[in-house]
């Protein structure tokens, strides 16, 4: 049934021709952004790798026939093709705001149009090829007369159509209405133009409008990031019907194909929609099928002359789909295609399950091998029960229970929050927090409030407090311990309040009249600290362990058949024999990746970015892009924030002159803490480009210390997520690492600390990498780079103590457990270097790390 024009039409599935893969074209090194088809059947693709390529089918294969290279850094975002009187023309919309015009017989552009100020994200040729339309991030639509365009001389009389307030993403024309056009924008509106005059404004989408299809002079369709197709009446500028996608969160393109509409979008799918005029004359659009492709995003789709469908993927490929059995791909291609799709869907399913059940997986260090066992914790459940299940699954002794429970709480904020009673928020420095502790600095000063939330790690809360009050980083472990202890007290207090009974000697969980013998959940004995015997009741742990606690050892009695008596069972870390090649302590090896510089709202960075943006010519950011960057300072890193506009903002702003890059890198180091943006900028070619850009900045040795600080912080924060870790762990260290080490020796303490933190994170990434596979070279290279930079320093007294401690952490971690690397360090006289570093610190934690390094050299 037809709806009122505002509700979603329910989707049905009907039979349709079965599409299968015909060809997979490895077209571009990065995203294939746009497609076009010539009258002769040639396929054209434009990519983010700065190329446009022509593909012709010869026999059963697609072969590249032409390639047009764009200048370095000028990615292709839109293309349009036209047959003119003097030959074909290819129009290429580029990121710098230019439109390059190519033709036959020469590789260089016939002309370059410069009227747009920013990225040209859409191009359209009208049906008679008399005019081209272009849309840009500068919010303008420009109409270009192209009938007499040639390679020698022609002066354009362009028509600029202002009206949209944000980027223009799609264009269309009416075949039966000359000089009448449509434009769709990020401002959520569609405008109908006659020349440069706005005839109508269509409002109905709730997000960016990305695609347009004209059906007749009186009707058209639009689609966008709200996941809907809307059927519009031109005369009244009103919605006729609205249809919801079955596949895409965002719809990126929409194309007509015989009796179907094709849409591509965010989820790497191709959706088929059947069009039916309906008995009542109303148009009905029904989602019939969704084809999964291996790629993450599908940017565009075009119908070929033989009715096959070409789909542009974010993986740089072009996927050709067909219904003709004679054009079906060979079995090996089909198998590979299906395997990639299955892998993608499997990963998606696992991700959805994990999100649905809110399950967190952490690695538990039981014996001398780091990250050996997986522990899965479901948010909102009792960490004690989780620890019991973990022990049972892995056949571990019950005396590990307390240690594993604490381990879970230390690493998972939701576990610490379990059973915490809700209380009134406290306000510190104008912000609300769950709790706050008083910290006395001495010297007669009043206590400072150290705030923390139950959903954040003690380490992070302590780091925030240290940064806010400019305290030594060496006090972070102590402050984090205070917060952790307070969380434990709060948790116990909440448990007591819930039970309703508390014994002043044993605490909660004692015997309660008429209550279940094990309802307390713990049943702690005031003398043994372990589970007591309860007649006719199962052990308080929830599974039968066969013993209760020994009052002297806290462990169970000897049992000949017990699995823990095999000689190979796990034991507490404190009971392990000391291994001088693997020293352990609060800071050794590096306990986790350090994230630096997250305090504050970034008002100064935002103001500076806007100021410097006004000075840019080719790479000026539009309001959409600036707003996207501003959001980075207000969204938590757990939001997994990402958007194409934000990505493009960085791609453009990183092209600014070096002296203008300080605010850009300030935003980038925040972006790298978000999983999606980290994955985007640190993956494959983009990752190598990022590393190259950071190297270029440090090589230029800018006078601006803040710029060098932010380069080091970008490197450090890149280790926040796996893709960034893999990038820098696999990067050639001979160039970048020495540059970072050089910053450690700078006279500015803030630069020393930022660079040393980058090195510490680097060492941890290489250590974790070596645990998975033997790869000696990178650790050796990092060690050599550090030693080459610091071995000639006679005294480190001018360095900040915090930076020295981080540097020592980097050294001990890169050597940790690897006899070959330790031997290399020993041959390079690291004991003497460690002694000089030890002399420069007064803090015991720093001195202990230096002693650990010396002890390691004695072990080989």
Curated annotation (Swiss-Prot):
Gene Ontology CC entries for this record: cytoplasm; nucleus
Q: Where are the WD repeats?
A: 27-65, 71-112, 115-154, 163-203, 204-242, 244-283
| Tissues where this protein is expressed | Expressed in intestine (at protein level).
**Alphabetical UniProt keywords:** Cytoplasm, Repeat, WD repeat
Query: Where in or outside the cell is it found?
Result: Cytoplasm
Q: Does the keyword Cytoplasm apply?
A: yes
Which intervals hold domain PUL?
586-856
Write down the PROSITE patterns for this protein, in alphabetical order. PFU, PUL, WD_REPEATS_2, WD_REPEATS_REGION
Q: What is its main location?
A: cytoplasm
Q: Where is this region: Disordered?
A: 494-585
For biological process, the GO terms are: proteasome-mediated ubiquitin-dependent protein catabolic process; ubiquitin recycling
Against Pfam families, the record matches this protein to: PFU (PF09070), PUL (PF08324), WD40 (PF00400)
Which terms in the Gene Ontology molecular function aspect does this entry carry? ubiquitin binding
Record-annotated PFU domain positions: 397-497
Q: Which family does it belong to?
A: Belongs to the WD repeat PLAP family.
Assembly and partners are described as: Interacts with cdc-48.1.
- Summary of the function given for this chain in its UniProt record: Plays a role in protein ubiquitination, sorting and degradation through its association with cdc-48.1 and/or cdc-48.2.
Q: What is known of its domains?
A: The PUL domain mediates the interaction with cdc-48.1 and/or cdc-48.2 C-terminus.
Name of protein: Ubiquitin fusion degradation protein 3 homolog
Q: Which gene encodes it?
A: ufd-3
């Amino acid at each position: 049934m037809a709806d009122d024009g505002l509700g979603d039409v329910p989707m049905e599935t009907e039979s349709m021709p079965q599409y299968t893969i015909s060809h997979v074209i490895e077209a571009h090194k990065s995203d294939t952004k746009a497609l076009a088809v010539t009258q002769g059947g040639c396929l054209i693709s434009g990519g983010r790798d700065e190329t446009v390529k022509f593909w012709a089918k010869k026999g059963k294969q697609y072969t590249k026939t032409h390639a047009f290279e764009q200048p370095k850094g000028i990615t292709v975002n839109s293309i349009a093709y036209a047959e003119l009187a003097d030959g074909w023309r290819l129009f290429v919309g580029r990121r710098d705001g230019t439109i390059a015009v190519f033709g036959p017989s020469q590789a260089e552009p016939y002309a370059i149009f410069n009227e747009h100020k920013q990225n040209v994200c859409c191009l359209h040729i009208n049906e008679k090829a008399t005019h081209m339309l272009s849309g840009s991030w500068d919010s303008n639509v420009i109409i270009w007369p192209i009938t007499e365009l040639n390679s020698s001389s022609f002066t354009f009389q362009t028509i600029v159509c202002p009206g949209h307030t944000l980027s223009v993403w799609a264009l269309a024309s009416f075949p039966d209405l000359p000089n009448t056009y449509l434009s769709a924008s990020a401002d959520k509106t569609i405008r109908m133009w006659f020349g440069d005059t706005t005839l109508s404004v269509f409002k109905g989408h709730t997000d960016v409008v990305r695609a347009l299809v004209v059906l007749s002079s009186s009707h058209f369709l639009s689609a966008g990031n709200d996941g809907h197709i809307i059927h519009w009446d031109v005369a009244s500028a009103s919605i006729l019907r609205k249809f919801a996608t079955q596949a895409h969160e965002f719809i990126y393109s929409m194309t007509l194909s015989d009796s179907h509409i094709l849409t591509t979008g965010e989820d790497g799918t191709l959706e088929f929609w059947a069009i039916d005029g309906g008995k009542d004359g109303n148009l009905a659009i029904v989602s019939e099928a969704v084809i999964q492709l291996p790629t993450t995003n599908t940017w565009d789709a075009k119908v070929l002359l033989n009715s096959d469908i070409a789909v542009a993927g974010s993986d740089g490929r072009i996927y050709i789909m067909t219904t003709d059995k004679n054009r079906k791909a060979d079995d090996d291609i089909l198998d590979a295609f299906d395997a990639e799709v299955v892998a993608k869907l499997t990963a998606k399913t696992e991700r959805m399950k994990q999100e649905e059940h809110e399950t967190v997986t952490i690695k538990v260090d039981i014996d001398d091998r780091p990250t050996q066992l997986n522990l899965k914790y479901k948010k909102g459940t009792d960490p004690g029960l989780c620890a019991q299940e973990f022990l049972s699954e892995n056949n571990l002794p019950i005396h590990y229970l307390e240690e594993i429970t604490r381990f879970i709480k230390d690493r998972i904020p939701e576990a610490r929050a379990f059973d915490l009673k809700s209380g009134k928020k406290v306000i510190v420095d104008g912000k609300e927090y769950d709790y706050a502790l008083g910290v006395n600095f001495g010297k007669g000063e009043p206590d400072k409030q150290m705030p923390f939330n139950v959903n954040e790690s003690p380490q992070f809360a302590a780091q925030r407090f240290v940064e806010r009050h400019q305290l030594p980083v060496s006090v972070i472990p102590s402050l984090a311990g205070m917060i952790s202890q307070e969380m434990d007290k709060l948790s116990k207090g909440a448990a007591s309040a819930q039970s309703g009974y508390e014994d002043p000697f044993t605490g909660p969980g004692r015997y309660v009249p008429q209550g279940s013998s094990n309802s307390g959940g713990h049943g702690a004995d005031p003398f043994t600290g372990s589970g007591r015997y309860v007649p006719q009741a199962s052990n308080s742990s929830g599974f039968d362990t066969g013993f209760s606690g020994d009052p002297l050892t806290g462990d169970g009695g000897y049992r000949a058949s017990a699995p823990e008596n095999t000689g190979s069972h796990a034991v507490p870390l404190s009971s392990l024999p000391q291994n001088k090649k693997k020293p352990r302590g609060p800071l050794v090896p590096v306990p986790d990746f350090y994230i630096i510089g997250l305090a504050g709202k970034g008002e100064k960075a935002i103001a500076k970015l806007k100021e410097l943006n006004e000075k840019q010519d080719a790479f000026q950011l539009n309001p959409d892009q600036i707003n996207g960057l501003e959001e980075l300072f207000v969204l938590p890193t757990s939001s997994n924030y990402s958007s194409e506009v934000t990505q493009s903002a960085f791609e453009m702003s990183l092209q600014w002159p070096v002296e203008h890059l300080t605010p850009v890198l300030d935003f980038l180091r925040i972006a790298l803490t978000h999983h999606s943006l980290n994955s985007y900028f640190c993956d494959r070619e983009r990752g190598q480009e990022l590393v190259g850009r950071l190297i270029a900045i440090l090589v230029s040795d800018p006078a601006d210390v803040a710029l060098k600080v932010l380069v080091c912080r970008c490197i450090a924060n890149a280790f926040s997520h796996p893709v960034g870790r893999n990038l820098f762990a696999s990067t050639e260290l001979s160039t970048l690492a020495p540059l970072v080490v050089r910053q450690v020796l700078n006279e500015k303490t803030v630069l020393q600390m930022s660079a040393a933190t980058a090195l510490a994170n680097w060492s941890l990434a290489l250590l974790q990498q070596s645990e998975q596979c033997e790869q000696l070279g990178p650790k050796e290279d990092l060690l050599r780079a550090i030693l080459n930079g610091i071995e000639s320093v006679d005294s480190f007294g001018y360095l900040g103590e915090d930076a020295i401690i981080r540097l020592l952490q980097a050294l001990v971690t890169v050597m940790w457990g690897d006899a070959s690397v330790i031997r290399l360090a020993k041959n390079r006289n690291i004991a003497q270097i460690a002694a000089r570093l030890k002399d420069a610190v007064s803090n015991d934690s720093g001195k202990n790390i230096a002693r650990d390094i010396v002890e390691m050299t004695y072990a080989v």
